[in-house]
Amino acid sequence: MQPPIPAPLKHVSRTPATPAVAKALTRLQCWPGEQRVAVGLSGGVDSSLSAALLVEAGWQVEGLTLWLMSGKGACCSDGLIDAAGICEQLKIPHHVVDSRATFQAEIVDQLVQGYQQGVTPLPCSRCNRSVKFAAMLSWAEKERQLHRVATGHYARIRHREDPEPQQALPGDSSGRHQLLRGLDQNKDQSYFLYDLSQDVLAKVIFPLGELTKAETRQEAERYGLRTAKKAESQDLCLADHYGSMKAFLDNYLPARQGEIVLQDGKVVGEHDGIEHFTIGQRKGLGVAWREPLHVVQLDATANRVIVAPRAEAGRDSCVVGAVNWISIAPPSSAIDVEVQVRYRSGPVAAQLIPIEATAEDIAADRPHRCRLTFNEEQFSITPGQAAVFYAADAVLGGGLIQQINTASS
């Protein structure tokens, strides 16, 4: 038997704090079909307000927290306590799903393996696809017969049944749900969501997609939510859990000294592990040289960090594999796109050309691959990170950077 539909929050004024909040509430109130949802609660202010807005809009809401790691931290006991407290405030049920084994196998072990191979992995997009949304939807449907989940991500989805017209995109987008950037450019998280499937997009709600972080804080305080003034966690939950990414890596990988060299092989310094470096890095190299040096390659076989002056560090082409086309069908010919190659970097113009997939990608059921040629040289194209393709604020797709090269190579 399902729990009763919770009453709207009585202590909240009926006048939303901002027009964006009013628009979000109206959209939720007018949502077609069954208004029952599981809200992923991390214990932070973003997911807390998402739950509060859904309750205010009259939805039947159940809180769901994934237990990802043991110990203290945003993903652990501290987050669980705050998530439970929010559910108590909102008078909604709270459930905890133990996902530690899946998180260890799919994220931690894969992350460590990637660093050992000399790449800089992007665990957040993999976690969204393989752990978070998979676990939430599986639990919601099997245990509570709930067919939608909501989270506090700053992104938007233009569902195909929405009354608002879909964006015109380069490529075939007919019959597809479209993933869009969040309106707050400083908090937009669409970069980490490119790998979701159409089936998942159909069942997901992002109540904060039209809000800024400041509006979220303001509205959370208006609700009196216990997490309204909670400090931001780090972008990477593992860094938050261990105190820093270096502490996480030191916990799993023993120090392995090697050389820092120029592209011609000249030794200019030493390092304690290639996993502590990333492409484009300039600070913290521990190298005294006549001009600033940038990391241009991590050679796992030779255990070397390869550096170069900025004039030699630019790259204008890369190969992207395991591509997921989310808002359009896979293109058969070249298209012009904007590309984001790091979460905190802005989009840059490039031409995308589909190329033949590797046997490894095909075996993993990820048969799409492409070459990107950038209009201007880039200095932080990093194997293991995602290259996400945009048209204006729509996410066309994305994949993992496999190879960096110049246009002539």
Curated annotation (Swiss-Prot):
Domain of life: Bacteria
Coiled coil: none
Record protein name field: tRNA-specific 2-thiouridylase MnmA
Any single biological process term in GO: tRNA wobble position uridine thiolation
CDD domains: MnmA_TRMU-like (cd01998)
Gene Ontology cellular-component terms listed: cytoplasm
Cellular localization per UniProt: Cytoplasm
Enzyme class: transferase
Site label Interaction with tRNA, positions: H153, Q385
Family: Belongs to the MnmA/TRMU family.
Region (Disordered): 156-179
Catalysed reaction, written as an equation: S-sulfanyl-L-cysteinyl-[protein] + uridine(34) in tRNA + AH2 + ATP = 2-thiouridine(34) in tRNA + L-cysteinyl-[protein] + A + AMP + diphosphate + H(+)
Species in which this protein is naturally found: Prochlorococcus marinus (strain MIT 9303)
